[in-house]
């Protein structure tokens, strides 16, 4: 089968011929139709410090996918050959306290497909049946291929009650933009999304017309608070950028007793003004992955009830054009990039 592989410990990925995975009794074999390129895949392509310390070589990469079941393990029930599916890319154990309590996404032994084990940038993927998520007929494959990052957005946005609340989102990457769409869909009053990249903000306005976009290099966030008639500030903050400056700005823009969900990852240690957070009585929640499988149920239900994130997909390439796809993603000018394996 064709597969995109990190074959050497250096920049790039390589198209190779790899054996079709053999499945175990509790696995399924999925024929891949569409895959999304993720920021994690860019780290692996660039072979930065994180990738060099995390990813064994060789490794078939990729973890955002949609496809069709073509083989079932002998003990698999509830799934069928020909069924359209996506799936959770975090593979968990069953022995930790978190897993035994049903908090699967917090299992400390979690491994990721395309990072720790062979991934989805291939014509076929082996996946535990436990991780498989069937796709309803009204959700197309290319949306199925971005459910993983949409799940990050949903998990982050729904960390706190948003109904009637004013929400600040820092970072207008694809996940931040989808979080803005989720927040409006969930009943937030005002949703403001900030960035320093004008192209990303233009895309955010295109995907979520009812959100207010702010280029913080050109516009003062305090003026926006006044413009919207917020007496104290925002009720909820969703930090998606990993920027310390953005987090500092968010803390200042929140009401007393405000809440922050953190998904963005800083490039290193950051000097946090904890006294300001304490004296404003701010609640902070770190967000990792997707709740298994509550996040999946919620995002599929929202997609079937009017949530539209299709415009966040800006580039589509055949898999043989993967270099162009990665170049688009690395440019900082794209939304989601989808590769077609059919």
Swiss-Prot record:
It is an enzyme of class 1 (oxidoreductase). The active site is at 40 (charge relay system), 43 (charge relay system). Binds 1 Zn(2+) ion per subunit. Zn(2+) binds at residues 38, 63-64. Keywords: Cytoplasm, Metal-binding, NAD, Oxidoreductase, Zinc. NAD(+) binds at residues 175, 195, 200, 263-265, 287-288. Its cofactor is Zn(2+). Pathway: Amino-acid degradation; L-threonine degradation via oxydo-reductase pathway; glycine from L-threonine: step 1/2. It is found in: Cytoplasm. The record marks 148 as: Important for catalytic activity for the proton relay mechanism but does not participate directly in the coordination of zinc atom. InterPro entries: ADH-like_C, ADH-like_N, ADH_Zn_CS, GroES-like_sf, NAD(P)-bd_dom_sf, PKS_ER, Zn_alcohol_dh. One of its GO terms (molecular function) is zinc ion binding. Gene3D superfamilies: Medium-chain alcohol dehydrogenases, catalytic domain (3.90.180.10), NAD(P)-binding Rossmann-like Domain (3.40.50.720). It catalyses: L-threonine + NAD(+) = (2S)-2-amino-3-oxobutanoate + NADH + H(+). Its EC number is 1.1.1.103. One of its GO terms (cellular component) is cytoplasm. GO terms for biological process: L-threonine catabolic process to glycine. Catalyzes the NAD(+)-dependent oxidation of L-threonine to 2-amino-3-ketobutyrate. Belongs to the zinc-containing alcohol dehydrogenase family. Homotetramer. This is L-threonine 3-dehydrogenase. It comes from Ruegeria pomeroyi (strain ATCC 700808 / DSM 15171 / DSS-3) (Silicibacter pomeroyi). The gene is tdh.
């Amino acid at each position: 089968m064709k597969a995109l592989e990190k074959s050497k410990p250096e920049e790039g990925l390589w198209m190779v011929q790899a054996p079709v995975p053999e499945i175990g009794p509790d696995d399924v074999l999925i024929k891949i139709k569409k895959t999304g390129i993720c920021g994690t895949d860019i780290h692996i392509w660039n072979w930065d410090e994180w990738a060099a310390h995390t990813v064994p070589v060789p490794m078939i990469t990729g973890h955002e996918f949609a496809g069709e079941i073509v083989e079932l393990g002998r003990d698999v029930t509830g799934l069928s050959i020909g069924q359209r599916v996506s799936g959770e890319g975090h593979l968990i154990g069953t022995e930790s306290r978190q897993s035994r309590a049903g908090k699967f996404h917090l299992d400390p032994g979690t491994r990721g497909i395309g990072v720790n084990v062979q991934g989805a940038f291939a014509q076929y993927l082996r996946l535990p049946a436990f991780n498989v998520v069937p796709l309803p007929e009204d959700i197309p494959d290319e949306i199925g291929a971005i459910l993983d990052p949409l799940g990050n957005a949903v998990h982050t946005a729904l960390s706190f009650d948003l109904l009637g609340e004013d929400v600040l989102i820092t970072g207008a990457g694809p996940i931040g933009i989808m979080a803005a769409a989720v927040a409006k869909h969930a009943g937030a009053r005002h949703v403001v999304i900030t960035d320093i990249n004008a192209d990303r903000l233009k895309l955010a306005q295109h995907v979520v017309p009812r959100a207010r976009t702010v280029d913080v290099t050109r516009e003062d966030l305090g003026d926006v608070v006044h413009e919207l008639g917020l007496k104290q500030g925002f009720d909820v903050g969703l930090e998606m950028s990993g920027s310390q400056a953005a987090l500092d700005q968010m803390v200042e823009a929140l009401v007393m007793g405000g809440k922050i969900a953190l998904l963005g990852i800083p490039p290193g240690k950051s000097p946090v003004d904890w006294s300001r957070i304490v004296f404003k009585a701010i609640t902070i929640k770190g967000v990792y992955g997707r709740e298994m499988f509550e996040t999946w149920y919620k995002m599929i239900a929202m997609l079937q009830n009017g949530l539209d994130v299709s415009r966040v997909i800006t580039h589509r390439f055949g898999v043989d054009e993967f270099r162009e796809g990665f170049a688009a993603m690395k440019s900082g000018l794209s939304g989601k990039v989808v590769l077609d394996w059919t």
